[in-house]
Curated annotation (Swiss-Prot):
This is 2,3-bisphosphoglycerate-independent phosphoglycerate mutase. Mn(2+) 2 binds at D28, S81, D471, H472. Gene3D superfamilies: Alkaline Phosphatase, subunit A (3.40.720.10), BPG-independent phosphoglycerate mutase, domain B (3.40.1450.10). Pathway: Carbohydrate degradation; glycolysis; pyruvate from D-glyceraldehyde 3-phosphate: step 3/5. It comes from Mesembryanthemum crystallinum. The lineage of its organism: Eukaryota, Viridiplantae, Streptophyta, Embryophyta, Tracheophyta. Substrate binds at H140, R170, D171, R206, R213, R286, A287, D288, R289, K361. InterPro entries: Alkaline_phosphatase_core_sf, BPG-indep_PGM_N, Metalloenzyme, PGAM_B_sf, Pgm_bpd_ind. It catalyses: (2R)-2-phosphoglycerate = (2R)-3-phosphoglycerate. Its cofactor is Mn(2+). The active site is at S81.
Amino acid sequence: MGSTEFSWKLADHPKLPKGKTLAMVVLDGWGEASANQYNCIHVAETPTMDSLKQGAPEKWRLIRAHGKAVGLPTEDDMGNSEVGHNALGAGRIYAQGAKLVDLALESGKIYDGEGFNYIKESFETNTLHLIGLLSDGGVHSRLDQLQLLLKGSAERGAKRIRVHILTDGRDVLDGSSVGFVETLENDLAQLRAKGVDAQIASGGGRMYVTMDRYENDWSVVKRGWDAQVLGEAPYKFKNAVEAVKTLRQEPKANDQYLPPFVVVDESGKAVGPIVDGDAVVTLNFRADRMVMLAKALEYEDFDKFDRVRFPKIRYAGMLQYDGELKLPNRYLVSPPEIERTSGEYLVHNGVRTFACSETVKFGHVTFFWNGNRSGYFKPEMEEYVEIPSDSGITFNVQPKMKALEIAEKARDAILSGKFDQVRVNLPNSDMVGHTGDIEATVVACKAADEAVKMIIDAIEQVGGIYVITADHGNAEDMVKRDKKGQPAMDKNGNIQILTSHTLEPVPIAIGGPGLTPGVRFRNDIPTGGLANVAATVMNLHGFEAPSDYEPTLIEVVSN
C-alpha cells in the first residue's frame, strides 16, 4: 500500500468495549516448569500467580518466549528481555540481532556494507580491535561470529588484530571461560601462521568489566576502558589462558566477575592499547550492555569518567545499539526495522499510556517495547517513570529490588484515572535468578507476586482489566540438567547452578471486573508466542489489531 493510504486508525472491536483501564504486567524471567526444589517460583509463596493459574484454560495459558517465536535463529536459542519485549510490543516476529548477523556473515554482505568499509581504512597501517563477550551463549554474542569476522577481516587486509575479551559465566556455565579462550587462542595462532599479527590484548568478567547497562555503574565501563584503551589493569599476564586460569583460582572468583587484566610482552608493555588511527568493533549484537561503552568510544563530550585519552578511531558496532541516539553512528549490520508497534497505534487511537520499571528493566518497557526507539510517540498521551535500581550491590543482596515501588507507581497511575494502559516490568525473578542464589531468588519471586497482587487490587477498584505475562524463563529452573533432565553435577559432586535464561514457555493470564463476559483464550493457537500478546491487548482496549499482526489469543463466546 502506498504511504498516502496508511492510517493509524484501528477498527473498533465488534464485541469488546473501549474505555477500560488495562494493566499490562511483565514478570521478567518467570517461566513455567515442573515443580521441584530448583524451581524458585514453585518453592516461593506466590498465592496471586497460583490463583491466576486456576483460571486455565480460559483465562490462563502458556505461550512461547524463545527461538523462532521471538525471531531467534533456532529453537535452542533462549529468549531474552530485549527480543521478548520487542515481540510483546511489535505484535509481529522480526529476525533478531543474532539472526541478522548470521545472515550478513553467511552471505558476505557484512563486508560490502558502509560500516565494514569504514573500519577497513585502518587495516593497512593500524590495528583492528574487537571487543565483546566471549562465549557461545547466544544472548549477547556468539563465538562463531567472532571467528568468521576474524577470518573475513584478515582476508580483507587486516594485518594487526587485537581481541579484548569479556568472560561470560552468566549465559553459559561458570568456568567455561577457559575453554573459550583456548579456542580463540588456537584461531589466532592460525592467523599468525598466515602472517597476521593477531592476539588477545585484554580481558575481564562481563559484570565487572565493560558490560554495565542503563548507566547503573560507570566504574564497570571505566575498568574496561583502562584495560582496552589505555592498556592498564591491576593484573598483567603473558597470555590470556594463563590470565583466566590464574584469576579463577581466587577463592570467590567466577567468570562474570573476573578482574580486568592486560596481556603484556616480554618487556612488560601492553600488547594492544587502542590508539589514534585504529579501528574498533564492538562484537555484541545485543544492545543493552554495549551502549555505555559505545558512548565512551564515540562521544566527544563525555563526563561519566576520566578517559585520560580519547583516541581518534574508526568505530563501528556489530549493530546500531540505539536507533534514536544513532549510537554508534556506524555499524556492520543494519538492525531490524520495527515499525507500527502496538504502543504507537494505541496512542494514535487515544489510549493514554503509563510505563514504569526500575533502571535495570526500564528500557525494556519503553525502548524495546516501542521497537528499539527512545522517547515518547505523543508526549501529551504518555508518561514513563524510572525508579532507580540499587547500585553497588549484586541483586541477591536486596532480592525484593524495587517491586513494591513499581507496584505503588502502577497502583497510583491506575487509580488516578489519567491512563488507559498501565504497563510495568517486575525484574526480580530475572535479575536475582542471574546471581544463581536460590534462596534469594525465592524471596525475589515472592516479592514479584506481592507486586502483582497490588496491581490487580487497583484494577479491581476501577473496574479494569489485567494482562499478566512474562518475557522469558529464568527463575523456574536454577540447575543445569543432563540429557535425561536430571540435575547435572560437577566433578566434586556439587549441583551445577544455572544462571541463564531457559527455553521454557511463560504464562499469560487475563482477568478483572472489566473483562467482558465470554472472553476466553482460543484453543486453536497452541503454539502462540509473545508476539500474539499485542493483538490480544489491542482487543481488550476495544480495537481490532492490524491485519499483519500475529493473531489475538482471545475470542468472545456468547453465553
